[in-house]
Amino acid sequence: MMQFLIAAPRSGSGKTTVTCAVLTALQRRGTDPCAFKCGPDYIDPMFHRSALGVESHNLDLYLSAPDTVRTLYARYAAGHGAAVCEGAMGFYDGQGLTTRASAWELADTLALPVLLVVQPKGASITLAAELRGLLQFRTPSHIVGILLNDCSEALYKTLRPMLEAETGLPVVGYLPHLPGCVIESRHLGLKTAGEISDLQQKLGKLADALVLNWTQLAVLTDRPAPAAAPPLAAPCTPSVRIAVARDEAFCFAYAETLDALRDAGAELAFFSPLRDAALPENIGGLYLPGGYPELYARQLSENIALRAAIRDAGQEGLPTAAECGGFLYLGQTLEGTDSKVYPMTGVLPGSGHNTGRLVRFGYAAMTAKADSMLFHAGETLPVHEFHHWDSSENGADFSVCKAKKRQWECGFASAHLYAGFPHLYWAGTALPRRFVQAAQHFLKHKG
């Protein structure tokens, strides 16, 4: 089975572009690949999903223990002909100035061969020096081959023999520069896949242009299929419906989190806060993931019926979990990207506003101060934050600590609520079971 991780010396090298080109090409070849993303990024898996038509999954060694990551990888790679994982940032870049949770650590944990994406612009033999450093920085590096990105055929033919002689690594192919296939970005990274109307055409052109020695790559990356691992939790029969917001405004939900909720006994009922006038019927819980509500603040405010329904549900004690953008939606008002302020659901105090910069960015550890729907007092969970918007009322039911000992308070928690900026990774934790139990209890005692 072909299994490999696509990494690069630094961010901005074209990992997502190359990964999507490779996935599309593998799909065309009838290989039936599956896709993974190293780290907590929500957007890159959307592009993988567009290339394959199936879910891509996150693997994060800060948010999850190594055994959990191995179990998730085995679960989602099962039955596929190839597994392709996209790295994050530079190959060795992890939490702070360490390799923790880096692409290299993920490759090391899963014993994955690494295909290194290199952009040759502005350098020649210096590339070989850089590659030697990457090969020697940690042992084993797991790097088995090189792919040149934004590279012409002529330059590929010139550089390939030199790089192979200097590094001992095969240069397995190249992807030429395609100006018409550039994927635009915004304040949280790339635009989402759903916002690019001609994405399928772009992916097709990338796959057409990709030059790759597939036979050589298959030999370099052939590994035994991952052994079946015991499930993180024994799957339960669906026992309660949980409403999950899913549309352009709320699109940051991990596929693994949704599967963990299903495994815990939830039937997921998806709805759109942009378009639906009511919550799904017969629900015992509500999950509002993150996303880009600030881009759609006007449209969200205009859906008066749903805003009222969510406010009423909150007052009735409907078990609710809201992360980042979902948390902003529960507030009183939200400043849109047009700088206008719009009413939101009003379940919580506070007004969301644009700070113009990243706020509390990165990994952190969040500790509960008291028992609540999802947490026990003193319980600590790894989380991450990534947002430019903030709230005038962030809550104080949790204490949060970053690696450099920076601390702050955040979040609202009660017997029926979790709401705050931190994104949670539910798989492999007690959160899904606790949320489902709260939903069951709500329905049992409703009315």
Annotated model-derived regions:
Residues 124-234:
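Internal gly/pro-rich beta-alpha loop/helix module
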Residues 107, 236-238, 250-263, 267-268, ...:
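C-terminal and late-domain segments of enzyme folds
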Residues 2-110, 118-142, 150, 154-157:
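ATP-dependent carboxylate-amine ligase catalytic core
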Residues 238-315:
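Phosphate-binding active sites in nucleotide-utilizing proteins
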Residues 1-2, 235-241:
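A short, charged/proline- and glycine-enriched loop
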Residues 5, 84-86, 115-117, 147, ...:
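Structural motif
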Residues 37-38, 171-179, 267-275:
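Beta-strand->loop->alpha-helix junctions that form or flank phosphate-binding loops
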Residues 293-371:
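Cysteine-nucleophile active-site neighborhood
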